[in-house]
UniProtKB/Swiss-Prot annotation:
Superkingdom, natural source: Archaea
BP GO terms, sorted: L-tryptophan biosynthetic process
Regulation: Feedback inhibited by tryptophan.
UniProt binding sites for chorismate: 237-238, 350, 369, 382-384
This protein's name: Anthranilate synthase component 1
Coiled-coil residue windows: none
Residues holding L-tryptophan: 27, 203-205
Complex formation: Heterotetramer consisting of two non-identical subunits: a beta subunit (TrpG) and a large alpha subunit (TrpE).
Pfam families: Anth_synt_I_N, Chorismate_bind
Catalytic function, reaction form: chorismate + L-glutamine = anthranilate + pyruvate + L-glutamate + H(+)
Length: 411
């Protein structure tokens, strides 16, 4: 490990972003989840898991579950990428339309923000890269953007009614339904990231410029393995933030029976997921129903922790909780089937997971508050539907969640 003079992370990323498969996983909020930032490029190899598993483009197996595929490859190094929500199609007898993609990196830069230090691990010409980064000028650009398509209020409210019908029929207790914006923009993924970093800083900021680019600011941990501990951070319960009224809004949010019921249901689901891979008696709720403030919304958050059973890999642990109950509903499998039926389109990466695996620590955020860019910017937001949901209210919840992400593309 080599120590370097501190340079702004976005300047360092800008200095390497013309290389292959560059990424930045950045902490942009002062919390326990906001200590480290990772930057790298030029992976040793890439892994794509769709209907088959490919390494550097070559088919190596017929495995279509990304967690099973990564277990089989026996990865050495830092594995960074995303598991597309579409991987859930494996659970309902369909083929994923969007592949899950990872790069395996043997060298990387890492920031420790508590110590305000920058290190490199096995990066060739690291000093030269850092010196080049010091000279980089980073400028935010608002750009020109146009909404090509947006999930209409009328359509979404009809979806909510269909979801409620399934709840009344006893199919599910809760279902999370989403809607999508498609935006034409002249902004680059990096420019969108700079804007999002300003408008919606979160514990999990990410920019992955792979075959498609992912630009995101997720508040929510899908799963984290640290040593032998497995941690899930369910977030459910949302209110729009208004300056000067945060305490009042938080109290109202915590006293809302619908929001409380939804949150408790998803904490129970998280406990069940953690129990699948953790020692009996080790699972506990370490934080329960705390209101956390974000730039545009307030969320109710909890944390579930357990100790992994012997022989459970990091990939096994993440598979146990994928996809997160907070983006599907409960019971999870039936909710997934109904989402496929009611939404009727491809979620892509949205509601999947983004992050990294390493030997000692692995950390995946839920792929929300994000832009998926493949020539057009695709932005989704969802709301949890329960028996007493009001369609109009659920529509505006999606609007509140998506507002700051739209600002990142100049809207």
């Amino acid at each position: 490990m080599q120590k370097h003079e501190y340079v702004n992370p976005v300047k360092l990323y800008s200095a390497i972003r013309d290389e292959k498969f560059p990424f930045i996983l950045e902490s942009a909020e002062k919390s326990g989840r906001a200590r480290y930032t990772y930057i790298s490029f030029n992976p040793l190899y890439t892994v794509r898991v769709g209907s088959r598993t490919r390494v550097d483009g070559e088919v190596i197996s017929k495995i279509s579950d990304p967690f099973d595929a990564l277990n089989e490859i026996h990865v050495k190094g830092l594995l960074v990428g995303y598991v597309a929500y579409e991987a859930v199609k494996n659970y309902i007898g369909k083929k994923p339309q969007t592949p899950s993609v990872f790069g395996c990196y043997d060298g990387y830069f890492v920031y420790d923000h508590y110590l305000r230090k920058l290190f490199s691990v096995n990066v060739e010409n690291a000093d030269k890269i850092v010196e080049r980064a010091k000279r980089v000028e980073v400028e935010q650009v608002r750009g020109n953007s146009e909404v090509l398509r947006a999930g209409s209020r009328e359509k979404f409210e009809k979806m909510v009614e269909r979801g409620k019908e399934q709840i009344f029929e006893g199919e599910v207790y809760q279902i999370v339904l989403s809607r999508e914006y498609v935006v034409d923009t002249d902004l680059s993924p990096f420019q969108m990231y700079l804007n999002l970093r300003e408008t919606n800083p979160s514990p999990y900021m990410f920019l992955l410029e792979f075959d498609r680019a992912l630009i995101g600011s997720s508040p929510e941990t899908m799963g984290r393995v640290e040593g032998n501990s497995f941690i899930i951070n369910p977030i459910a319960g949302t209110a729009r933030r208004e300056a000067g009224r945060e305490k009042e809004i938080a109290e109202k949010l915590l006293s809302d029976e619908k929001e409380r019921a939804e949150h408790v249901m998803l904490v129970d689901l998280a406990r069940n997921d953690v129990r699948k891979v953790c020692r009996a008696g080790s699972v506990r709720v370490s934080r329960f129903m705390e209101v956390v403030e974000y730039p545009s919304v307030l969320h109710i958050e909890s944390e579930v922790v357990g100790e992994l059973k012997a022989g459970v890999t990091h990939f096994d642990a993440m598979k146990a909780t994928f996809p997160a109950g907070t983006v599907t509903g409960a019971p999870k499998l039936r909710a997934i089937e109904l989402i496929d039926e009611i939404e009727g389109d491809c979620r892509g990466v949205y509601a999947g997971a983004v992050g990294y695996f390493s030997e000692n620590v692995s950390d995946l955020a839920i792929a929300i508050r994000m832009i998926e860019f493949d020539g057009k910017a695709r932005i989704r937001a969802g709301a949890g539907i329960v028996a007493d949901s009001v369609p109009e209210r659920e529509f505006f919840e999606t609007e509140n969640k998506i507002a700051r992400v739209l600002r990142a593309v100049g809207l």
